Design a protein with these regions (language model features):
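Extracellular beta-rich repeat passengers
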Residues: 1-18, 22-202
């Protein structure tokens, strides 16, 4: 594992057949990360990663049948999710562009990180939060405890969006954890006025 004394900048991963980048533990800080047209998640976080990130850019490859998430974020190491530290990265100024048929985030296993001042567009929906029955150590509890935060983010051009129900339509199941997360301070469904130049991603 790499500690917070290390900063990694200007990394591009293009057209990989797996994840773009995986953070498994540690506290390394990163800036200017570009994950383009990879076939699995763009940003995969697990095993207690607690670094800081800024300017994370992702554009998802459409592989059909529901492409993978923009980010799959796990909190702890299986099978015991109660062990500290659970993952808690802090990310600012991310821009993620989906493949239209995939979710932006899958959050699970006691993950408790933060995203602020970011843009997520062209996904099917924003959040899937997994909450195992009978467990007090879940990402849902991290939302309740105030340690899983999404504040002042823009969501746009999502297939599941319904103007009548608003932000609540951007959740996978519409459960209480997902609704609480999308409803946090400053989140909005609005056109970021960004234009993507066409590319096949091949």
């Amino acid at each position: 594992m790499v500690g917070s004394g290390t900063t990694i900048e200007y990394v591009e991963v293009y057209n990989n057949s797996d994840d773009g980048i995986e953070f498994f533990g540690g506290t390394v800080n990163t800036k200017y990360m570009v994950m383009a047209y990879n076939e699995d998640e763009s940003f995969d976080i697990d095993e207690g990663y607690r670094g800081k990130g800024q300017f994370w850019f992702a554009i998802q490859k459409n592989i059909g049948n529901g492409s993978d998430y923009g980010g799959e974020h796990d909190g702890g190491n299986s099978p015991d999710k109660t062990l500290a530290p659970f993952a808690h990265p802090t990310v600012y100024n991310a821009t993620w562009i989906g493949a239209s048929d995939n979710g932006a985030f899958r959050l699970k296993d006691n993950f408790g990180g933060e995203y602020h001042n970011s843009i997520f567009t062209n996904f099917k929906y924003a959040f899937r939060v997994d909450d195992p029955d009978g467990s007090s150590q879940t990402s849902g509890k991290q939302i309740t405890d105030g340690t899983l935060k999404f504040n002042n983010n823009i969501f746009w051009n999502m297939a599941d969006y319904n103007a009548t129900t608003g932000l609540s339509s951007l959740t996978n199941d519409g459960d209480s954890a997902e609704l609480a997360l999308i409803g946090q301070t400053g989140n909005q469904y609005a056109d970021p006025r960004a234009t993507l130049q066409s590319s096949t991603g091949s």
